[in-house]
């Protein structure tokens, strides 16, 4: 006969979670799930019609986890179908195609859609997100580099992984870390532990790196107007250099941003008497 202690231990081990996939059509959401659950890759594209549902069992941290996976269609046509499935979610697999930048730029829109459907009582800060930079096997056509994807993800406290559903690269590692984080979430009363949210860099640093990445010229990069004086250029440079120096800034892409700022200053000072 089971004791109360044994029953409590068993109930602690058993866990049921809900996971959804999000991202544009054709980024490989279904292929990532099939690669992990069925150990296979389906080369021919088959559009998800509305929602695909599956159940799998995994063992994480000495716990049996029953995972209910809702693979959501990425086409806007299916919005009225997928909007019913956002609530009561513990984990989200957010996918983009590294070869098509528009799928990366759509990630903010997916988050906005989820926030809208969760309503004022919803809180995505208490959901585990795993961002998959997918199709890294197609490196010849890559338009979103790792530092850009990692910066976007980590600035929001999301997990980030480079994956290939075709080769399987990064898939198992992603799911293991993803499920482990969800177990921690559930054990912490449905809230992400503080240690999981600490990202190691500021919003100002992340915003500056993104701005520098998209600047068209050296004036814009330093944030000064054409015709600025030598002192104004140096002042703007010093501010950014302190903010982004790789020894002090842990944000992905900080080293490249710092080098770009140094080069911008050098280029401008050459033309200022």
Curated annotation (Swiss-Prot):
Cite a single GO MF annotation: GTPase activity
> Mind telling me which SMART domains this protein's record contains?
DnaJ, RAB, RAN, RAS, RHO
Give the UniProt subcellular location, in the record's own words: Nucleus
Keywords assigned by UniProt, alphabetized:
GTP-binding, Nucleotide-binding, Nucleus
Cell membrane listed as a keyword? no
User: Which gene underlies this protein?
Assistant: dnajc27-a
Tell me the ranges covered by the J domain, including all copies.
Answer: 217-273
What biological process terms from GO does the record include? Answer: phagosome-lysosome fusion; vesicle-mediated transport
Q: What is this protein called?
A: DnaJ homolog subfamily C member 27-A
List the InterPro entries.
DnaJ_domain, J_dom_sf, P-loop_NTPase, Small_GTP-bd, Small_GTPase
- The source's domain of life comes to Eukaryota
| Chain residues that bind GTP | 23-30, 71-75, 134-137
GO CC, any one term: late endosome
The function of this protein is: GTPase possibly involved in regulation of the MEK/ERK pathway.
Q: Which family does it belong to?
A: Belongs to the small GTPase superfamily. Rab family.
